Amino acid sequence: MEGKTVISSLLIMSLVLAQIQVEAKICCPTKDDRSVYFVCMLSVSSQFYCLLKSKCKNTSQTICPPGYTNDILENSGDAVNEYCKLGCASSVCGALTTLQNFDTSKVLSEAVEQCTKACSSVCTGGSTAAVKSA
């Protein structure tokens, strides 16, 4: 039980810290490259590697450079929903997922599952329920 309390505390702290991070804009040449970037960030969590693998670029500008029209933060409803679910899981749950690669304990697996459920709940409007379940 003590382990679950620690994991839950880390999860809540990660959710809070993720809210205060400054987001850079990731620009990709195609939607497929954008998807490759998202999947890579979920599994590897090394932005440098994922940018190379996906051919995407990290920029601090408000507009993507020519040829990189598929930005991660575009305002279409589908993109926002996709970014929310995948971006939240990669940025907030990334550390837990990395730990899970080295430690396959049930407590850690449950923490990763709770984290991804919390992200999904936040993205679909149930942020209060997500915080309560964590």
Swiss-Prot record:
* Name of the protein in its database record: Thionin-2.2
- What tissues harbor this protein? Low basal expression in seedlings. Also detected in rosette leaves.
* Keywords, in A-Z order: Disulfide bond, Plant defense, Secreted, Signal, Toxin
Q: Propeptide per record: which residue ranges?
A: 71-134
Intrachain S-S bonds:
27-64, 28-56, 40-50
Q: Name one GO molecular function term.
A: toxin activity
Instruction: Give a short account of what the protein does.
Output: Thionins are small plant proteins which are toxic to animal cells. They seem to exert their toxic effect at the level of the cell membrane. Their precise function is not known.
Q: Which organism is it from?
A: Arabidopsis thaliana
Cellular component (GO) terms are: extracellular region
